[in-house]
Amino acid sequence: MLKTIHEKARHHTRPLWAWLKLLWQRIDEDNMTTLAGNLAYVSLLSLVPLVAVVFALFAAFPMFSDVSIQLRHFIFANFLPATGDVIQQYIEQFVANSNKMTAVGACGLIVTALLLMYSIDSALNAIWRSKRVRPKIYSFAVYWMILTLGPLLAGASLAISSYLLSLRWASDLNTVIDNVLRIFPLLLSWISFWLLYSIVPTIRVPNRDAIVGAFVAALLFEAGKKGFALYITMFPSYQLIYGVLAVIPILFVWVYWTWCIVLLGAEITVTLGEYRKLKQAAEQEEDDEP
């Protein structure tokens, strides 16, 4: 009986081990860590223009004035762990200065933000090894839609959650609402990664693969926030060495780590589909053998 159980265990772990080997092979071939470093560099250059464009969109809609403040706190609290207050002050100063720019400068900000979208598009399609190229107009429309509708949808979701909390008739549901809001960052990350892995690649991505890859990326992202904040708190070596400038390497390391998670989720999504195809091909060869 023990021998049978051992054989069944080996039978179930063998596909998992083969999939992990395939995942590691793809990560190595795609130079994932180098690609994450490139995206981190582009992201840091595009961070202020991107935030400036997003907040300018909220300024154009007075109904989102209160939500804009909530969204700022939500972004800096959930996407920039540790030293988020310092980074928030610097970025808001940069954004305030960008409001004094001319129309040409504003167009430059928009172009810089769109270049970040293009870099993300190129990186993900390189992982999917897609040779299909979208028309330029279509790509611009997709980038602009993400740049405009993304923040507005996030603001609308925050407005709805605030409205639910303000309802007196929902006092009996406060515990349920609190639990939902507690996992809201995880759900938002999961949905965001799922949309990223589903929409950006120029080839069809199986929905279940995108869901699994997005869920793993969301879990790693939330765990990474907690772990990174704990590391900064327990081992403040950056602050001892760099002093006031410690926020710069901390921000860079966090952005780099974030892109490693995003690309790892993409690699997982791709590998799930690729492993399934390889397994089907192997089974087909076995069936064709006499």
UniProtKB/Swiss-Prot annotation:
Q: Mind telling me which GO cellular component terms the entry cites?
A: plasma membrane
Entry keywords, A to Z: Cell inner membrane, Cell membrane, Membrane, Transmembrane, Transmembrane helix
TM helices/strands, residue ranges: 44-64, 104-124, 140-160, 183-203, 210-230, 244-264
Q: Where is the protein found, in the record's own terms?
A: Cell inner membrane
Q: How does it sit in the membrane?
A: Multi-pass membrane protein
By its UniProt entry, which InterPro entries does this protein fall under?
UPF0761_bac, Virul_fac_BrkB
Q: Could you tell me the superkingdom of the organism this chain comes from?
A: Bacteria
Q: Which family does it belong to?
A: Belongs to the UPF0761 family.
Name of the protein described by the UniProt record: UPF0761 membrane protein YihY
